[in-house]
């Protein structure tokens, strides 16, 4: 009797009652324990379905091929050859299956890539369609406004330059190339920058009023000249701009008639230039002599003027020194060339939000703008897209300050300061890593020093000084507080060896140092 599984003569034969097949008892029992099925037909089969077959006890003669040692060796050789051929065939089949599986995986990966690209193109098409609708609406509105203006016989004349280009005009490619090259240069040099003469925290704790400057009005905005920190620009609520020299301890000049309304922000620019922004919606650029001395400051003359339609709340100087960005309550952000006196482009008009503060990133590739609803918006200079929003403040964003190393952004409303990590902006909706709340205080100004290690927060009745270390958690820790009312606060650059504040109750500017 031949076993249906092994194909050899059985020693203990059994018969399946369901199929009549003969099996070796030990083999079929193992198969049933493992699979529970008939080997040839796949039908359910149990041990009770097997019947033992009784055979005679006569000794079976050996086959003729196994009667001698040479014959047995030949038999073993044939069996070995068959085994090797079967193994080789199995290896070939395994390799074929592996290649087919790899090919299927590559096809699956390619299909996923195609799907991702199509989804991206779909989203871009939707965004382009939405932008096109906004542009068409703006053009229709502008056409209606032009028709109304043509019907009006009175023409308003102004010496200030009002932007005429629409928001969809991109920044000139030549200008953007300069900005990109400067950004790459700054990224390389920033890693090599050291601050050997930087004031230590213990020294800053000892800061006190070392000098004060009396003026004929309250000073709303301050700026320390980064090229010569002996010079301090002051913007008054009477519309005048003052320049003070620490070296001579006197006012170099008072540039009167700069504005007819309070100066909201004043900046130093290269080539002995001062830029001021007022509540009268006008930005003024004035320039003196070739060197910043008392003699040349008295020779300041108005060079250019730029106009918004409502109060200019803030301005920021680009790291190149040739361009500024301005924020206004007329729901626009304008970029100007202060060297040639031209309006370059506008941002954020489609957002329909009043902008209360603005600041360029130290690398100069994008800027942040604070809004009246407590949101800080990031705009890319090249694409002009609002690429990210920082949230968490409840009222208008009064002031913004970037750390010079480019890692952090601080923004403040009336009594809360938020510290955001720009490196995590792509991974979180609002990557704020620390919140500072000043109860019973109204925050007026915040300012990072040049080393990015100190942060000053000035409020209506206190100056709060903090250290900032990226390796500690939280990164900002308080090091000192000074009881003093403030309207503005600025660190000296680059060594942070003093800072200046303006009083909210007196016509005075205080200089704090050791």
From Swiss-Prot:
- Give the UniProt record's GO annotations in the biological process aspect: DNA repair; mRNA splicing, via spliceosome; protein K63-linked ubiquitination; RNA splicing, via transesterification reactions
Q: Which Gene3D superfamilies does the entry mention?
A: YVTN repeat-like/Quinoprotein amine dehydrogenase (2.130.10.10), Zinc/RING finger domain, C3HC4 (zinc finger) (3.30.40.10)
Identify the metabolic or biological route this protein is part of: Protein modification; protein ubiquitination
Which top class of enzyme applies to this chain? transferase
| EC number(s) given by UniProt | 2.3.2.27
Against PANTHER family, the record matches this protein to: PRE-MRNA-PROCESSING FACTOR 19 (PTHR43995:SF1)
Could you tell me what this protein is called?
A: Pre-mRNA-processing factor 19
Gene name tied to this protein: prp19
């Amino acid at each position: 009797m031949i076993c249906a599984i092994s194909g050899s003569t059985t020693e203990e034969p059994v018969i399946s009652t369901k199929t009549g097949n003969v099996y070796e008892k030990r083999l079929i029992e193992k198969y049933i324990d493992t699979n529970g099925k008939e080997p040839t037909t796949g039908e359910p089969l149990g041990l009770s379905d097997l019947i033992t077959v009784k055979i005679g006890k006569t000794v079976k003669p050996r086959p003729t091929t196994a009667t001698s040692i040479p014959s047995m060796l030949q038999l073993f050789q044939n069996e070995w050859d068959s085994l090797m051929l079967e193994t080789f065939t199995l290896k070939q089949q395994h390799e074929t299956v592996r290649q087919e599986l790899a090919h299927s995986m590559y096809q699956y990966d390619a299909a996923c890539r195609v799907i991702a690209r199509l989804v991206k193109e779909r989203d871009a098409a939707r965004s382009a369609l939405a932008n096109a609708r906004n542009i068409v609406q703006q053009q229709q509105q502008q056409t209606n406004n032009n028709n109304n203006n043509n019907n009006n016989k009175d023409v308003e004349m102004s010496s200030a330059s009002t932007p005429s280009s629409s928001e969809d005009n991109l920044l000139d490619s030549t200008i953007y190339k300069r900005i990109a090259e400067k950004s790459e240069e700054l990224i390389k040099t920033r890693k090599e920058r050291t601050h050997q003469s930087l004031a230590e925290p213990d020294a800053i704790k000892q800061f006190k009023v070392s000098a004060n400057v009396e003026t004929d009005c309250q000073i709303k905005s301050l700026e320390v000249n980064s090229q010569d920190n002996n010079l301090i620009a002051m913007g008054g609520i009477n519309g005048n701009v003052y320049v003070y020299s620490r070296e001579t301890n006197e006012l170099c000049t008072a540039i009167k008639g700069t504005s007819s309304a309070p100066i909201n922000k004043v900046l130093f620019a290269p080539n002995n230039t001062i830029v001021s922004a007022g509540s009268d919606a006008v930005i003024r650029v004035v320039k003196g002599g070739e060197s910043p001395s008392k003699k040349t400051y008295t020779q300041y003359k108005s060079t250019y003027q730029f106009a918004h339609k409502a109060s200019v709340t803030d301005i920021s100087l680009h790291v190149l020194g040739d361009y500024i960005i301005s924020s206004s309550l007329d729901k626009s952000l304008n970029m100007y060339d202060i060297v040639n006196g031209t309006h370059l482009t506008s941002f954020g008009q489609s957002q329909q939000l009043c902008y209360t503060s603005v600041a360029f990133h130290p690398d100069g590739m994008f800027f942040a703008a604070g809004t009246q609803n407590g949101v800080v918006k990031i705009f890319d200079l090249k694409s002009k897209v609002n690429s990210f929003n920082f949230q968490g403040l409840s009222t208008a964003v009064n002031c913004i300050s970037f750390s010079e190393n480019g890692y952090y952004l601080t923004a403040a409303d009336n009594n809360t300061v938020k510290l955001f990590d720009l490196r995590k902006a792509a991974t979180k909706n609002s990557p704020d890593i620390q919140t500072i709340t000043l109860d019973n205080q109204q925050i007026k100004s915040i300012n990072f020093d040049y080393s990015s290690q100190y942060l000053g927060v000035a409020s209506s009745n206190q100056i709060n000084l903090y250290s900032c270390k990226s390796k500690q958690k939280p990164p900002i820790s308080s090091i000192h507080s000074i009881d003093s009312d403030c309207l503005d606060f600025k660190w000296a650059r680059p060594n942070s060896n003093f800072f200046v504040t303006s009083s909210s109750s007196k016509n005075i500017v205080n200089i704090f140092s050791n």
